[in-house]
Structures are given as C-alpha cells and as structure tokens.
C-alpha cells in the first residue's frame, strides 16, 4: 500500500527527468557540459554520420547519449542511488575507463586492435550501467542505453575505425584526443 502514496519528491524527480530529456539537443547540452565533452560529442556525431551516412540517425544517437547522461545526473543529484548501486557505479566507472584506455591504445598502436576484447569491454560496460539505472529508468530509456552501446559495439564500425588506413582515421584521432583530455580532467 505504501507504493501508492503520493510523493511530491517523486513527481518532481520525474518532471526533472522528463523536462531535461526533452531539452536534450547538442546546443542545450553544451550549456551544461564543458568544452572537451562537447567536442567529444561533436566528434562522435561525425563518426556516426560517416559510418551510417544518415544525419538523422547520428543526431538521434547523440541525443540518446545526452538524455542518458542527463537522467543519470538528475538521479545522482537527487540521491536516488542506493549504497549498492553506488558501488556498482564504481564498477561501471572502472570498466568504462578500461574501455576508453583500450580505444586509445588500439588507435595509437597499429595492429594491436582486438575486436573480441573491445566488444566484450563495451558489453560489460553496458551491463554494468544498466545494473545501476534499471530500477530508476523506463524501458524506453533502457532501450536508449542499448542503442548507444550496440552501435558502438558493432563489429563493422570497430573494424573500420581501427584500421590503420581507416576512412575514419582523422575523426578517430580527434575522439582519442578528446577522451585523453576528458580522462585527465576527470570529466569521464
């Protein structure tokens, strides 16, 4: 019966998540995020657009990233995560940082790319993130997480992106530089 009790805080939290997710465009996001993160999103957009050849799909993917980050930020700011979920968040952070370090290494050192390893690392990050947010987000939001991780875990994208003569080489260099900067400043 306690589940049916009206709580203003819950309504307020849902309203914040809804409003912020509706405002999730690259330009709005730039007012909430630093220059390095904005640059990273712009370069991820370029990579998505180059890979898919579809501007709308690339925009949707970046909007999904922004919506996910905003919603997680709202949940964290409102202390919605349990101690166990915060521990899982630390696990996600470690896994995601390992994925980022692998991306940097595979880009910077030719012929070291390991598709199976990177796909496994991306999939583990996805599972870790969903284990934190599943109780708090809708199925639609969880689907957004899957879309983002599935796109970036795609074998064709990864194999193309990490070839030494990749058509994505220039944008991958910018992405790697952005990841390096963001990791140094603790932004991701």
Curated annotation (Swiss-Prot):
Q: Please give the Gene3D superfamilies that the UniProt record associates with this protein.
A: Tumor necrosis factor alpha-induced protein 8-like
Offer a single GO CC term for the protein: cytoplasm
What domain of life? Eukaryota
MF GO annotations: cysteine-type endopeptidase inhibitor activity involved in apoptotic process
What start and end residues bound the annotated signal peptide?
none
Q: Name one Pfam family in it.
A: DUF758
InterPro entries (alphabetical): TNFAIP8-like (IPR008477), TNFAIP8_sf (IPR038355)
Gene Ontology biological-process annotations: positive regulation of apoptotic process
**Family assignment from sequence similarity:** Belongs to the TNFAIP8 family.
Protein name, per record: Tumor necrosis factor alpha-induced protein 8-like protein
Q: Which organism is it from?
A: Drosophila pseudoobscura pseudoobscura
């Amino acid at each position: 019966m306690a589940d049916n009790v009206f709580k203003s805080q819950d309504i307020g939290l849902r309203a914040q998540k809804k409003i912020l997710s509706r405002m999730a465009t690259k330009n709005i996001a730039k007012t909430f995020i630093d220059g390095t993160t904005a640059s990273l999103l712009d370069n991820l957009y370029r990579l998505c657009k180059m890979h898919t050849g579809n501007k709308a799909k690339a925009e949707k993917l970046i909007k999904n990233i922004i919506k996910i980050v905003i919603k997680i930020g709202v949940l964290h700011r409102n202390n919605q995560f349990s101690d166990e979920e915060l521990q899982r968040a630390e696990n996600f952070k470690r896994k995601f940082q390992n994925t980022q370090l692998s991306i940097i290494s595979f880009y910077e050192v030719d012929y070291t790319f390991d598709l199976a390893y990177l796909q496994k690392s991306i999939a583990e990050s996805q599972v870790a993130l969903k284990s934190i947010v599943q109780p708090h987000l809708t199925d639609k939001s969880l689907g957004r997480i899957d879309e983002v991780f599935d796109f970036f875990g795609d074998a064709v994208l990864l194999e193309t992106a990490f070839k030494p003569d990749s058509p994505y080489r220039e944008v991958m260099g910018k992405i790697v530089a952005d990841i390096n900067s963001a990791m140094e400043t603790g932004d991701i």
